[in-house]
Amino acid sequence: MRTKNVCTFQLILFPKVRSYIPLPLILKRIEITKNCISTRGETTKTSVTEKLSEEKTVVVEPVFGFLKAHFHSTRFSEEATKRRKRKWALLVVILRKYTARNSKQKRTKKTRQKGVRSSFIDERTPFSFIFWLVLFRPLFNVLPCSAQSLFVQEFFITSPCLVCPAFPLEQNVSAFAPSTNGTKTKQMITITPMIRFIVVQLLTLRFSYRTVKGISPLRRRAWFFLWFNRSKCFCVGSIHKRNKNKADKQYQTEYSFHCCSTPIIFILVR
């Protein structure tokens, strides 16, 4: 049984450790640290740890206490959760890096002006993909009806989602709006992602029932799930402040509006 003195020493020195450390060992550890300070480096840290590891007796809880005592962390500890989060974040970065198109090759930098933040012009267009899709569309007519129902519908559903870039087009809307102090300040009209999300959903539902005619209910459900999740990817935008002039107190905001061109591909092809 643990005595009161041992419990108090353990709470003071090691509040998070679930192991039994006897009182003489705690006192010896304090003496060793005092000697280490008094002798000014004559006894090194390695010798101190060796002495402690030889005489330490650990009584731990089963399974998780053993893991915590010997490996210093379990799956449910704080260090392990941080490690898992870092792994998932790295996986997301890798997937986004290798699924999107190479932005360095497809984007050109604007000429820098005085007081203007350097931005990018997005030159990625889906016309090459539309041309490829229209060119090879008659090849699928050779397949029988069963093969077409199995492969062609999934091909036309998934291929634009995978091949087309996430943000194919960009559009900036600007206007003059009065500010609070009465002076006219040029600023961009901010279009909220929710409005864009509704527009994408309407474009999707406009031709969805005609496209999924003859598909099984399970496959139709998967079709809608894929489309609705894909449309959420287009609802990513940000407002950037730029041209901040303290003398004129003018704040020009820019909003990048990324249009969804994937439903347009379906309308043109189908």
Swiss-Prot record:
Catalytic activity reported: Endonucleolytic cleavage of DNA to give specific double-stranded fragments with terminal 5'-phosphates
Gene Ontology BP term (one): DNA restriction-modification system
Organism domain of life: Bacteria
GO-annotated molecular function: type II site-specific deoxyribonuclease activity
Enzyme class: hydrolase
EC number(s) from the headed UniProt entry: 3.1.21.4
Keyword terms of this UniProt record: Endonuclease, Hydrolase, Nuclease, Restriction system
Function: A P subtype restriction enzyme that recognizes the double-stranded sequence 5'-GATATC-3' and cleaves after T-3.
Stated name of the protein: Type II restriction enzyme CeqI
Source organism phylogeny: Bacteria, Bacillati, Actinomycetota, Actinomycetes, Mycobacteriales
Gene name of the encoded protein: ceqIR
